[in-house]
Every structure is written in C-alpha cells, then in structure tokens.
C-alpha cells in the first residue's frame, strides 16, 4: 500500500513539475516570438515611411507629373496599407520602378540616396523576417504560435533603382533546387 501511495505522489509531482515547465517554456517562446514580430513590424513601418518620402520626392521633382505616375504611386500606397497581399504590393512597386526607369526621370542624388536607403531597409526587413520565420518553425514554437494566431511573414524581393523581374512571373518559376528533381512519384 505504501508503494502505491509513493508511486501516485511521484506521478502527481512529475505532472505538476511538467505543467509548470510547459507553462514557462510557452510563455518564453511567445515572448520571443512577439519581440521578433514587433521587430518585423517596426521595420515595415520604417520602410513605409521611406516609401512615402520617395513618393513625395517623385511627385515634387517630376516634370511630367503624368497620370500614370500618380496612378502607380497611389496603387503602391494602397498596397502598403494591406500588407497581407505582399505579392500585389511588390507588383505595384515593380511597375512604378519600371515606369521611373523607362521614363528616365533624372531626379538626382536625393533619389539615389532614397533608393539606397530603401534597399538597405529591405535587406534589414528580410533578415528580420528570416529570423522570425526560423524561430516560428522550430519545434515546439510553431505549435504555440499557431495556437495564438501567428503566421509566417513574407520576404520582399524588389530592388529600388534597378531593373527587376516581374514578381508575379518570378513567383511562378520553379526554384533552382527543384529543376532537376524527378517528381513522377508524386502522381501515383
């Protein structure tokens, strides 16, 4: 009888300690995830602010001030408000960037410095997103994250002031690692 009581107390103690450890691991994981998410969000806000500066500069310096330019700037602003549709935002930025490069709008060193800053912020944003996504995918972090409604973030692929590939076409391409892979076993 004493052995059974000892065994029951031992199991209850193990369960209580296990629940306490689980609680602290979950709390720590969610705090770290929240920090990384806030870092991604703050970089997105910094990126958005710099794009607003770019838009003001483009519209003030542009001699043509064409309807197309205003249209592309407005589409870009609308896309930034809804970060969920990142591919659409990138497509609008691609179109605006292409329009500016094709029209050869020479806006001087200010534009070059803004483009350089935008590219630096994009690089920072992508590294922050990578850090967040890697932390998100580690076991058991993704379980806690899904329970709290966190989702993976998407990377930006646009480079400002340079010729880019259409992001929609780029998203349809087969990745380099999958080009020579036999996938016939998947269709069986």
Q: Model-predicted segments: where are they?
A:
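A helix-centric hydrophobic-segment signal that preferentially recognizes long
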Residues: 2-188
């Amino acid at each position: 009888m004493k052995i059974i009581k000892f065994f029951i107390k031992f199991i209850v103690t193990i369960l209580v300690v296990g629940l306490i450890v689980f609680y602290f691991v979950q709390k720590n994981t969610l705090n770290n995830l929240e920090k990384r998410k806030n870092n991604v969000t703050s970089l997105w806000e910094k990126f958005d602010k710099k794009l607003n500066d770019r838009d003001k500069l483009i519209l003030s310096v542009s001699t043509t001030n064409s309807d197309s330019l205003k249209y592309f700037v407005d589409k870009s602003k609308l896309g930034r408000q809804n970060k969920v549709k990142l591919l659409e935002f990138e497509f609008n930025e691609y179109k605006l960037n292409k329009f500016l490069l094709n029209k050869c709008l020479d806006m001087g060193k200010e534009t070059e410095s803004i483009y350089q800053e935008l590219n630096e912020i994009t690089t920072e944003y992508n590294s922050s997103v990578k850090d967040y996504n890697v932390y998100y995918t580690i076991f058991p972090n993704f379980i806690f994250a899904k329970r709290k409604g966190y989702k993976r973030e998407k990377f930006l692929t646009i480079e400002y002031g340079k010729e880019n590939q259409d992001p929609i076409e780029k998203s349809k391409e087969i990745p380099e690692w999958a080009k020579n892979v036999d996938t016939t076993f998947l269709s069986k």
